[in-house]
Structure formats: structure tokens, C-alpha cells
Swiss-Prot record:
It is a multi-pass membrane protein. Disulfide bonds: none annotated. The keyword Transferase does not apply. The chain crosses the membrane at residues 332-352, 359-379, 393-413, 495-515, 522-542, 555-575, 700-720. It is found in: Cell membrane. It comes from Rickettsia typhi (strain ATCC VR-144 / Wilmington). Keywords: Cell membrane, Membrane, Signal, Transmembrane, Transmembrane helix. This is Uncharacterized protein RT0032. GO terms for biological process: protein secretion by the type IV secretion system. GO terms for cellular component: plasma membrane. Residues 1-28 form the signal peptide.
Length: 1135
């Protein structure tokens, strides 16, 4: 019975509800849905998540990617998320009255942006405490509505719906603040929330605390223009043509905010106006390159990576090369990601155990990484637009790399100990902050070239030299080389000019290389970045991972290479400054460029210039902490030459001014004068080379030591600069830029060559003018004792044309003229020195023959040596004139360039038949760069030596002739030689030339008598290496020859090459050893040709001057250990 009333009550309530539901079924359903939606936001946190998923961002007016939220949570854990879910800025239901702020249409509309004159931000924070009270109130009102309905049998749903209306103002607390305002919000759950209003360029944000400081949570834009707007780079704030209504400062053309052309100034003018150096050279070039890159990668409407957010969702990105490639690669990248997901799924299915969680995390991070940096992440899933994507290359990679090039180099550039050209303390606009590096470079180049003379002179006298004692109208930063150019120009001595200009030319050359290398690095980064959609997906698979690693390594290398070059320049500058300026310190002064105002017709210029000058305030302990620093600066060559009058004045003032004053008290004259060190130094003392006053000697010594230091520095830096590109590439494990950029020594070498040519021309003109006519020309070509002065030998009986193309007995002196007959000369085998006489032959042969004197012994000439002495039939030449010519040419070896490289052709003649000719088809690199080309040149030289050995062996065995002898038998030596030679011909290394059957040599062979042929046949197997004043023959490792009277000594070459050279050092050592071998062979051949090098000397042999010189050179090689003689004749096979 106790349960009966309770059961009846439950049955009545259920029947009431069911009946009520049948009556108002549709109305109840809508009301229940509204209640369920409201109950899903039981707390401020759950309500914030619901708003984030179902509506637009309510916490900010500026849309941000989800990736940003994840990053911010790492920077500010817990605090950021709690503030993020409770903050409300973009909510029209809240901000529509005076309490929260009246913003018709919503707080985030264009018309309701923050006024820059009153930068106040309105926002609200959700309170869980008030939310609990509001929800309790709704439950109470719903219960009352149900009770009312039960008693009155009315419809309760309208009352329930009204009770559960989302009254946001009941549980939100309004705030307002300007930049700098902060406070705390207290609540249930997470008890304290710290907030602060900050300004970030053209936006006002509500922030909270994080590891890196204030972390923005929700932001709102300010109206433009305002003093520090990011749009100042694109529009002229003072130009009213862009403003439709001056009262609200609204631009009439919104695209003007992101249009580079609206500014009215090009890239050059922008960089020039932002530069702080007096002479602007490099920064406009870099700025134009950066703008070109921004237009190429982002859009034609932007000039900087700082404004990429302005065109993210615009169709103007269609002009971007990177964007077009990304669109084209979209399906390919999607295919890569699909394959990666499939492979990972197969791995999970086929694995015997569950993979660790780290693999799942790695899987997800790889997909996000590849998508973000290859084609971009779609920030709006409901929108399929290609323009609405987050691109990691544009937002992170390119700004980091391109700004990092200048940033890293700028750290090094401003590390100069003297304080010269330091621009890091000057404030630049953020968009052009990189110009500090190029201002420092321009300042350095202008300083060392003396281009900043006028500007420094103006600031020197305007800001520092106000009194007469310190006034120096000759004070300017002219470099010391100026004082060498003046006497060089007056005296005409080009050596002084070369010495004076060597350092500034090296500075220009290295600076040009730095600018060129930086530009090439920027362009290379752009090319690699555009290919990111191709290389980034290769990160997914182990098989293609190496391609991605190489791509990243190249990007980092191009980032670091300019820093390495700048480090070298700073080292060069610092050593030079210390050598010339000692411990002098520089001060700077920022002045307005009034000169440009006058040049522009009185229009006021906005550009300020930073001027540097030597600080001669010796009492400034911040820069000169001790007296040694002061004395080092005063006694430096640079300071004395830059400040000549000031130096002389201070010297006289410190040492003489007190002497003129009256002597104090009863002090004796000797005691009074003993206080002045200047007078005690006037006495004569020993100098470096002669007696001189001590004071004068000290000054000369300082100058001399400074010059030695500067020259030594120049020598070191010059040699190191030749390998600067390779050094930078090796340090960064990248590609050297010397093949695509100007070489560090290019300008220096070109200028030095021009100066050398100018000096040679000046010297030649002076000699011709002093000696007159032909004598000067004859001395210039080194042909003394000849009959005529005709340099080209185009007329006359005998000319001075010296053709150094063969050379055995003497130089091949080709004489042409109207009275002479074309001649060809052949040598004899009778002696080591051929004596010649003239003989005329008919037109069928048309050659001159040098016939031998009578001799009982015939020694055949070595076949690899071609000795021709063409002479004329002119009766004006005596029989001894040829010997005199040979002797004069030997004495003037330095004037006649007869030390050419190893010949690529060998043209030889034989007593019996003419030798064939051949050409060597392999060609070395003229200016080898890199290990590969150096190694190829070494291989070509080795191949040339092999060819020459094979050719000499072929000729020595009786082969290699156009027409063989009738009675000649083919020996085994000749067969082997011909086989080896044919291998070179078949491989294409050499090409034979046999089209000389009717040559002079073969016609001469038909004219020779039988007795000569029999003598040659008798001695055809004897090899006699005759080297008669010929430096053009190819090197041999050994020369084992015999003479009829005494055998030659044997020797061994003691230097050994690396078998498999690795690295530049071993390749260079091998090249040096080969050069040393050539030098040894030249010395040996000269020794043998002069009659030396025998085991037993010939009886009655006379030692000539030539032999004495040859033996001296050979003995030096023996003493140095390069070669070792074997005079016991045990190893000489021919003795």
C-alpha cells in the first residue's frame, strides 16, 4: 500500500508528458535540440571548443592556422589554451552595448578596426563561476515551468526554451585596454589567467605569458595609415591621393597596400634611401635581386617576404613560379603520401608485434612535414581553393635562408676591433635591415680606395676640429698608397704604381667576388626552393632519402658560404688595419646629407649618413685604455699619412713649445733641457744603413716595419684568395662557386696585367726613343749582331725573324727576302756540332743542305731530335757569321723565348727516308679548376710521355718512316715498337700524317750517295742522344747512350709519384715531381750535348764554357738528392 501513491504519481507524470508530447511534438523537438546544444557547453572550455569547431574563430579577428595553435601551446603550455578557449573578440552577441562596446555588425568588420589615435581593444573572458550560476538559474526556471504546466495543463515548452536561452553576457566579463595594460582574471578550475594588451606592428593583441615572453592569443587590426604600419613600404602615408576621406584615413584603392608600384620608387631608390653609408654601391643591387625573388616566388604584387600574408588567399599568386610548380606537383605528392600510408599499413599488418608509439608519431609528423613544405596545408577544408594554403617554403624556409645569408655575414662583418664601418648599432627599417652588411662593405671599399675623402673631411672639420690647435685641413681618410702613386706618376715607374694599387685592387676583387657569390647563393636557393615539391616527398622513403639530404645540404651550404667569404675579408681588413694604423680606434657620427639636398635643388633629403674618423682624443679611456695604445696609433704609418699637419703640429707642440718658455727658477740650462726627450734624440746614432738622428730613425723604422707588414699581409691574402671559393665549399660541404661566379683574383689579375702591359709599352717607347730606330727594335727581340733590323723580315736581304720551332745546333733562323732562295736545312751525323756551308739546288728540290766537313767517324743523330738551320745564299754572310749568331743567341737566352712547352708534334728527318708526322689529339684544360680537371691534366701529361716514349722507340728501331729501306729487315724490337704505336693510333690518341711522300726529306734521301747509306745501315742500331742547345724536346726518364770513344754514365731519378693520388695535395705533388723530372732531363741532355756525362773523358778534350755551365747545373741536382749517378757503369747497358 505504501508504493501505491508513488506508482500512481509516476504514472500520472508519464501520461502527462506523453500526452503533452503528442500535442506539441514538433515544438518539443526544437526546444530539446536547443537545450542539448546549450548543455554541451557546460563549461567555458567546452563552449570554446564547440565554437572553434562549428563557427568562425571567436577569440580573434585575424585568422590563424591550426598549426599556429599547436606551436603556441608548446611555447606557453596550459596558459595559452586556457586563455584561448575563454577569450572572446569576434562575437556580435556580446559587443553591442556600452558595457562591452558597441560595434554594429561585429567588432571584426573593416569599419570597426582600431583607431591608431586611440588604440584601445575591447574583449571579454568567460567565467566558469558565473556560468554555473547561469546554468543553475536555467534549471530552476525549467522546473518551475514544468510544475506550472502540471498544475495548469498548459504547454511548458515556450517557458523552458526561454529559460535556457544562451545569455552570454551573464557569464562573460568585459575588458578593455591599450598597449601595455595588463591584469588577472580569477575563475573556477584554472584559478588565475594573466592577460596583457600588446601591439604587434599594425595589430593590437591580447597576450599571455610564455617561455619566449608575451604570446599573442587574439588580435585585431588597426586602421591605416599609422606611424609604424607595415604598409609604409608600399604607400606614401603623406600622399592624399590614396586617401578617399581625410577624416577616417581610408585608402581609396585597397590593392595599393600590397602593390610595389604604388610607392613610386624602384628597388634602387628604396635601397639608396635606406642606406647609411656615404657612397652607396652594393645595397641597391642586392635589394633588386631580393625584390625579383619575392615577385618570382610569391606574387607580382609584393616586394618582400614580410608581406606574404597579404596575398595568401588572392588569385595574384597565380603569377608565382613556385605556386605553379606546386599545383602541377599536387597529384604526384598526393601519390607519394598514399604510397607511404599503404606501406605503413602493410607494415602494421605483417609485423609480428605492435609497433611502438614513436613510429605512429613519426608517421604523422612525416605526413605533416611533407605536405607543409611541398604543396602546403589547406587551412579551410570546406574551401577547395588552391590559393588558401599554408606554404612552409614561403613562410619559413625562404625568409630564413635569404635573411640568414645577410644576418650571419653581418655578425662577422661588424666584429672589426677598430670600430671602422660598424653599422650594427644603427636602426634600419625591418624590411631593409639586411642593408647593414652591404653598408659595411661599401664603407670598407670606399675607405681603402680613398673615395670617402670629401665626406670625412667635412665631418672632421664640422664636428671635431673646432679649435685652431686641432684643425687639420689636410685631414682625410686617404689610404697610404696615395703617397706612392704621386711619385710613381711623376717618375713613370710602373712598379711603384703596381705596388701602390695592389692592395686596393685585391680589396675590390674580393668584394666583387663576395657580392657575386652572395647573389649566386640567393639564386641557387631560389632554384632549389622551387624544386621543393619534387625533393621534399623523397623524405618519406629510405631509398630516396639521400636525394632529400643532398638537397638540404646544398641549401645550408649556400647559406653559409657568404659568411666564410666575409670572415676572410674581415681577417684581411683587420691585419691590414693593424699593420698600417696600429691600435687606432674609430668614432662615428650620424649626419644629415646636406650635399644631396643642394644637388636635388633644395628638396630635403630623408637620408642620413654615418661617417667614420680616427679618434684623436687621446684622453678617451674607453677606446685608449693605456699609453701603449695611444703611442701605437700616433706612430702608425696610416695615421701619420692621413694626418700630416696634425702629426707635425702635435710633435712640435709636445717637444718644442715648452723650450721657448722661460727657464723656471734657478734651474740650470742642462737640467732644464734634460727633461725633453726630443732634444736627447737629435744626436746621431746608428741606423739601419747609415748614421741618422735617433728620432728620425725611429720614425723611419716604424714606417719600414709597417710597409713590410702590409706587403706580407698582401702576399698571404693574395695566395689564400685563389682558393677562397674551394675553401668555402669544402667548409660547408657544398659546391664551389668559382665556375659560376667571378674568381676572387680576377679583377686583381686583370688590373696587374694592364699595368704590366702599360709599363712594357712605356719602356719600349723609351728605348726606341733613346737608341733610335732599328737598334731599339733589335734589342727588344734579342737578336744582336744581325745585318738588318726588320722585325717582320718582310724585305731586305737578311732579316731578324727568329722562329724558335726546332733548334739543335742553333736557332732556326728563317731568312726571307728578294735575293734569297727558300731553304731547308738538314743535319749531319759526323759530330755533335754541325758545321754548315751553302749549296744551291734546283727547283725540283728547292732546299738548302748543310753538308758536313770531312770526317772519318759518322755518328747517327737521335731520331727524336729535329735540327734545322735554314740559311741564305746571300754573299753578305761570311762563313763564321752563323757561329756568331748562335753564340749571340745563346748569350741572349732570356730575351729569346725558346723555353716553350713540350711539343705536341715531332717532325724528324732521317738520312735514309723521311719520318712520318703525327699529331697528339688530347688537350689539357687551360685553367684547371677542381680536383677533376687537375687529375685529367695529369693523366694527359702521362699519356703524352707514353706516346713520346713509344715514338722514340719506334724511330730508334728503324720504323716510323714513310718509305722503308729496300734491304732493311724487320727486327723484333721494331715489331714490338710498331705494335705499341699502332695501339695509340687505333685508340685515337695520335693521328699519323703521311702526305709528305714528295717532301724535301725524301728527295734529299734519293740524292745521298751509297756510301752514306752504308754508313747509316752500319750504325742504325746505335742510339746517340745528341742534345745541342734545344729545350723543346720531350722529357725522358733515362738517357743511356754511348759514344765511339767513351760510354755515358748512368743515373737514377730518386723522386717517386703517388700511385693513386687522393686529394689536391697529392695531385699537386705528383705534378711537381713530373716538372722536376723534366728539369732533370733537360739538364742531362744539355750535359751530354756539351760533351760531358762520360765515364771516361776523351783524351785532349777541352771543357767549353757551355759544358762547365751544364755540369754545374747537373751537380746541383746531384747534391740536392734528386738524381744519383752510377759511374761504375754496372747498370749502363750500352757502355
Amino acid at each position: 500500500m505504501a508504493l501505491f501513491p508513488r506508482g500512481i504519481l509516476i504514472a500520472l507524470v508519464l501520461s502527462f508528458v506523453l500526452n503533452l508530447g503528442l500535442v506539441t511534438k514538433i515544438h518539443a523537438k526544437d526546444t530539446l535540440d536547443s537545450i542539448i546544444d546549450i548543455l554541451s557547453g557546460l563549461t567555458c572550455e567546452t563552449q570554446g571548443v564547440g565554437d572553434l569547431m562549428r563557427t568562425e574563430f571567436s577569440h580573434t579577428c585575424i585568422v590563424a592556422p591550426f598549426f599556429t595553435f599547436a606551436v603556441m601551446n608548446l611555447v606557453s603550455p596550459v596558459l595559452y589554451m586556457n586563455t584561448f578557449l575563454k577569450l572572446k573578440i569576434n562575437d556580435s552577441d556580446l559587443f553591442n552595448d556600452s558595457n562591452f562596446g558597441n560595434f554594429p555588425g561585429g567588432q571584426c568588420t573593416r569599419e570597426n578596426r582600431i583607431d591608431p589615435k586611440n588604440p584601445e581593444l575591447h574583449f571579454a573572458l568567460c567565467s566558469n563561476a558565473k556560468l554555473i550560476v547561469s546554468r543553475a538559474k536555467s534549471v530552476t526556471e525549467s522546473a518551475l515551468a514544468i510544475a506550472k504546466a502540471v498544475l495548469t495543463w498548459s504547454d511548458p515548452w515556450d517557458d523552458i526554451k526561454q529559460a535556457w536561452e544562451n545569455k552570454k553576457k551573464e557569464y562573460h566579463i568585459p575588458y578593455r585596454g591599450k598597449p601595455g595594460d595588463d591584469g588577472f582574471a580569477f575563475d573556477v578550475g584554472f584559478p588565475v589567467i594573466y592577460w596583457k594588451v600588446i601591439q604587434d606592428r599594425d595589430r593590437i593583441c591580447v597576450s599571455t605569458k610564455g617561455f619566449t615572453g608575451d604570446v599573442p592569443v587574439g588580435c585585431k587590426y588597426m586602421k591605416e595609415p599609422f606611424p609604424k604600419s607595415i604598409y609604409n613600404s608600399f604607400i606614401d602615408v603623406e600622399d592624399k591621393n590614396f586617401i578617399k576621406d581625410s577624416t577616417n584615413d581610408t585608402p581609396s584603392d585597397p590593392l595599393a597596400l600590397v602593390s610595389c608600384s604604388a610607392a613610386g620608387d624602384g628597388c634602387y631608390q628604396k635601397a639608396y634611401n635606406a642606406s647609411k653609408t656615404a657612397i652607396v654601391m652594393t645595397s641597391p643591387l642586392i635589394e633588386c635581386i631580393r625584390q625579383m625573388i619575392a615577385r618570382l616566388l610569391i606574387s607580382k604584387d609584393v616586394c618582400s617576404f614580410d608581406n606574404v600574408d597579404q596575398v595568401v588567399n588572392l588569385a595574384s599568386r597565380q603569377d608565382s613560379a613556385l605556386f605553379q610548380f606546386q599545383v602541377g606537383m599536387h597529384k604526384i605528392v598526393t601519390a607519394f603520401l598514399t604510397l607511404y600510408v599503404m606501406f605503413f599499413g602493410f607494415k602494421l599488418l605483417l609485423a609480428g608485434k605492435v609497433p611502438p608509439k614513436s613510429e605512429y608519431i613519426n608517421f604523422i609528423l612525416k605526413i605533416i612535414f611533407v605536405t607543409y613544405f611541398s604543396i602546403g596545408i589547406n587551412i579551410n577544408p570546406s574551401n577547395g581553393s588552391q590559393y588558401d594554403r599554408l606554404d612552409g617554403m614561403i613562410q619559413w624556409v625562404f625568409p630564413f635562408l635569404l635573411n640568414g645569408i645577410s644576418g650571419l655575414a653581418n655578425w662577422v662583418m661588424n666584429a672589426a676591433p677598430s670600430g671602422l664601418c660598424k653599422f650594427n648599432n644603427i636602426s634600419y627599417d625591418k624590411s631593409v635591415s639586411y642593408i647593414a652588411l652591404w653598408d659595411a662593405l661599401d664603407c670598407r671599399v670606399a675607405h681603402y680606395l680613398g673615395l670617402d675623402i670629401l665626406s670625412t673631411l667635412l665631418v672632421e672639420n664640422s664636428y671635431r676640429s673646432h679649435d685652431f690647435l686641432n684643425f687639420d685641413f689636410f685631414s682625410f681618410s686617404a689610404p697610404p698608397y696615395i703617397y706612392l702613386i704621386i711619385p710613381a706618376i711623376i717618375s713613370g715607374n710602373m712598379m711603384l704604381v703596381s705596388l701602390a694599387l695592389s692592395y686596393p685592387l685585391l680589396v675590390i676583387s674580393v668584394a666583387a667576388f663576395m657580392v657575386n657569390a652572395t647573389i649566386m647563393c640567393m639564386i641557387s636557393i631560389v632554384i632549389l626552393g622551387i624544386l621543393a615539391p619534387l625533393f621534399v616527398p623523397m623524405f618519406l622513403f629510405a631509398y630516396t632519402r639521400n636525394y632529400f639530404d643532398s638537397w638540404v645540404k646544398l641549401m645550408i651550404s649556400f647559406l653559409l658560404q657568404p659568411m666564410v667569404v666575409v670572415t676572410f675579408m674581415i681577417t684581411m681588413f683587420a691585419v691590414y688595419d693593424y699593420g698600417f694604423y696600429g691600435k687606432c680606434q674609430y668614432k662615428s657620427k650620424l649626419i644629415h646629407n646636406s650635399i644631396e639636398d643642394k644637388m636635388q635643388g633644395g628638396i630635403k633629403s630623408k637620408r642620413d649618413v654615418l661617417i667614420f674618423y680616427i679618434n684623436n682624443d687621446w684622453d678617451d679611456t674607453s677606446q685608449y685604455p693605456d699609453k701603449d695604445s695611444v703611442e701605437s696609433c700616433k706612430n702608425s704609418l696610416g695615421y701619420m699619412l692621413n694626418n700630416p699637419i696634425n702629426t707635425a703640429f702635435n710633435f712640435a707642440k709636445d717637444n718644442i713649445s715648452e723650450i721657448v718658455n722661460s727657464k723656471p727658477g734657478e734651474t740650470t740650462t742642462d737640467e732644464f733641457l734634460s727633461k725633453f726627450q726630443f732634444l736627447s734624440g737629435v744626436v746621431l746614432g746608428p741606423g739601419m744603413f747609415f748614421m741618422s738622428p735617433k728620432v728620425l730613425f725611429e720614425k723611419i723604422k716604424n714606417i719600414f716595419l709597417a710597409l713590410i707588414t702590409a706587403c706580407f699581409t698582401l702576399y698571404l691574402m693574395y695566395n689564400f684568395s685563389s682558393q677562397l671559393a674551394e675553401f668555402a665549399a669544402d667548409m660547408t660541404e657544398g659546391v664551389a662557386l668559382n665556375n659560376v661566379a667571378i674568381k676572387p683574383q680576377a679583377i686583381f689579375k686583370a688590373a696587374m696585367a694592364a699595368l704590366a702591359n702599360a709599363g712594357t709599352a712605356t719602356k719600349g717607347i723609351d728605348q726606341i726613343a733613346s737608341r733610335g730606330g732599328g737598334g731599339g727594335a733589335r734589342d727588344l727581340i734579342g737578336a744582336k749582331g744581325l745585318v738588318s733590323d726588320n722585325i717582320a723580315s718582310s724585305g731586305g736581304a737578311v732579316g731578324d725573324n727568329i722562329a724558335s720551332s726546332g733548334g739543335a745546333v742553333g736557332d732556326n733562323i728563317a731568312v726571307s727576302g728578294a735575293a734569297s732562295t727558300p731553304t731547308v736545312t738538314t743535319t749531319t751525323a759526323s759530330s755533335s756540332i754541325a758545321n754548315s756551308m751553302t749549296k744551291t739546288i734546283g727547283d725540283d728540290v728547292r732546299s738548302d743542305i748543310v753538308t758536313p766537313h770531312a770526317s772519318t767517324t759518322a755518328v747517327p743523330q737521335h731520331s727524336s731530335i729535329n735540327t734545322t738551320i735554314p740559311t741564305s745564299v746571300s754573299p753578305n754572310i761570311k762563313s763564321t757569321s752563323l757561329k756568331e749568331i748562335i753564340r749571340d743567341n745563346q748569350e741572349n737566352e732570356k730575351e729569346i723565348d725558346n723555353t716553350t712547352r713540350a711539343q705536341e708534334k715531332i717532325k724528324s728527318s732521317s738520312k735514309v727516308s723521311g719520318l712520318i708526322d703525327y699529331s697528339f689529339n688530347l688537350k689539357e684544360h687551360d685553367n684547371p679548376t677542381g680536383i677533376k680537371q687537375i687529375r685529367e691534366n695529369a693523366e694527359i701529361r702521362d699519356k703524352r710521355v707514353e706516346v713520346e716514349k713509344a715514338w722514340n722507340e719506334l724511330v730508334a728501331s728503324g720504323g716510323g718512316r714513310i718509305r722503308d729501306q729496300q734491304s732493311e729487315e724487320t727486327s723484333e724490337q721494331r715489331t714490338n715498337a710498331e705494335k705499341k704505336w699502332n695501339e695509340f693510333v687505333d685508340s685515337g690518341v695520335v693521328t699519323e700524317i703521311r702526305e709528305i711522300d714528295n717532301s724535301v726529306n725524301n728527295k734529299l734521301a734519293d740524292k745521298l750517295d751509297k756510301s752514306e747509306k752504308s754508313k747509316i745501315e752500319e750504325n742504325k742500331n746505335i742510339e746517340n742522344n745528341i742534345k745541342v742547345y734545344n729545350t723543346n724536346t720531350l722529357p725522358q726518364e733515362k738517357v743511356n747512350n754511348t759514344d765511339k770513344s767513351s760510354g755515358l754514365i748512368d743515373y737514377s731519378f730518386n723522386l717517386k709519384e703517388h700511385d693513386n693520388p687522393t686529394g689536391v695535395k697529392q695531385i699537386r705533388e705528383n705534378a711537381e715531381i713530373r716538372d722536376k723530372r723534366v728539369k732533370v732531363e733537360k739538364a742531362w741532355n744539355e750535359l751530354v750535348a756539351s760533351g760531358g756525362g762520360r765515364v771516361k773523358e776523351q783524351a785532349g778534350g777541352k771543357i767549353t764554357e757551355r759544358r762547365a755551365n751544364a755540369e754545374k747545373v747537373w751537380d746541383d741536382l746531384v747534391k740536392s738528392g734528386v738524381v744519383k749517378e752510377k759511374k761504375d757503369n754496372s747498370s749502363n747497358e750500352n757502355s
